[in-house]
Structures are given as structure tokens and as C-alpha cells.
């Protein structure tokens, strides 16, 4: 279920780098809400509340400004490359009951068998869902899986109401395998034991 966040903003009619700098000094973020073929809405949002809200992946925003209220999702976030502060946000207006495509981060849970380790092949999975049901993450269970097992996109268990939306459902999302260093560490003692046994043989013959 998507996290719904309400933000109180203000309409803005001034633009440009100078205006944007003044807004940031005043702890505000300039933003644009796009709505298909309609005219976009230009707003300013409180910096602290908005920055905290953006920690939620695929959150659904209700933005109130000057008597208007728009429901939207984040389209793009522009950050200062040095200070990493938010300089501008693009939102996409959505309607209740509308389905959209989103990229959702992939996480794994559980423990594979033996020395096997789970590797995430796709960091984000593209899915389609209602705007009120956008998942923040997709969890793939690797509990008890053995070395060489692959979890394909078509096999990922998605939340109810969420559909896979990628071109190749056979694409590997998670691979379970034993790392090379783990294999080497288990075979090294056996290799070391062979010379020791060979050295013991002449000693026994000398008796």
C-alpha cells in the first residue's frame, strides 16, 4: 500500500535561478506538478517536510496550495551535486483509480542453504499498480534455496493488485550461489592434507 503524504504548499509565479536561490534560503523548494496535456501547476513546498517525505519510495502525495488540492507522484528530483540538497521536484498528477508504471527496489530475505549467498541481479523491478497501492519495495524470499538457484521475474511474488510490467519475464532477479572465495577456503585444507600424508609415508617405511 502506498504511503500517502500531505504537503501544504503555495502557488508561485516567479521563476529563474535567482528566485530558486531565494526560496531555498527561505527553506522552500520549487516544484512543478505536470498533468498530461493540461497546464502544469507551479508551487513551493516546505523544505524539511518535503525532504523527509521523499524518503518513502513511490509515495502518493496530496499537495494543497491556494485552495487547490492535487494528488501526485514524484517524477524527478533535482539535487545539488555537491551539497546534495533538493533544488527542484517534478510531480505527475494522478487520479484515484488510475494505474501507473513504477520502478520498485528489490530486497531479499531469508537464508540460503550451506555457504550459498543471494545476489540481486535487478536492483529495481518495473510493475504496474493503482496509485493508491504502489509498493515501496519488493521482497524476494531465498530461504532454503540451494547453490545455482535463480529466481526469475515471473516467479517473484508481488503484493495483491500489483502486476509485473517488464519485457522479459524470464529475466533473473536473484541468483543464489556459493562465492568463489568460500569454495577455495573449503578446498584448501584438503589440498594441504595431501602433502602431509605423503610425507608421513616415508617415515613409516623407515621403521
Swiss-Prot record:
Record's compositionally biased regions (Low complexity): 184-207
Family matches, as InterPro entries: Rbsml_bL25/Gln-tRNA_synth_N, Ribosomal_bL25/Gln-tRNA_synth, Ribosomal_bL25_b-dom, Ribosomal_bL25_C, Ribosomal_bL25_long, Ribosomal_L25_dom, Ribosomal_uL5_bac-type
SUPFAM superfamilies from the UniProt entry: Ribosomal protein L25-like
GO cellular component: cytosolic large ribosomal subunit
Record region (Disordered): 171-207
GO biological process, one term: translation
Listed Pfam families: Ribosomal_L25p (PF01386), Ribosomal_TL5_C (PF14693)
Lineage top rank: taxon: Bacteria
Molecular function as annotated in GO: 5S rRNA binding; structural constituent of ribosome
Cited CDD domains: Ribosomal_L25_TL5_CTC (cd00495)
Gene3D superfamilies (alphabetical): Ribosomal protein L25, beta domain, Ribosomal Protein L25, Chain P
Disulfide bond positions: none
HAMAP family, A to Z: Ribosomal_bL25_CTC
Subunit note: Part of the 50S ribosomal subunit; part of the 5S rRNA/L5/L18/L25 subcomplex. Contacts the 5S rRNA. Binds to the 5S rRNA independently of L5 and L18.
Function: This is one of the proteins that binds to the 5S RNA in the ribosome where it forms part of the central protuberance.
Family: Belongs to the bacterial ribosomal protein bL25 family. CTC subfamily.
Name of the protein this chain belongs to: Large ribosomal subunit protein bL25
Protein's organism: Bifidobacterium longum subsp. infantis (strain ATCC 15697 / DSM 20088 / JCM 1222 / NCTC 11817 / S12)
Upper classification of the organism: Bacteria, Bacillati, Actinomycetota, Actinomycetes, Bifidobacteriales
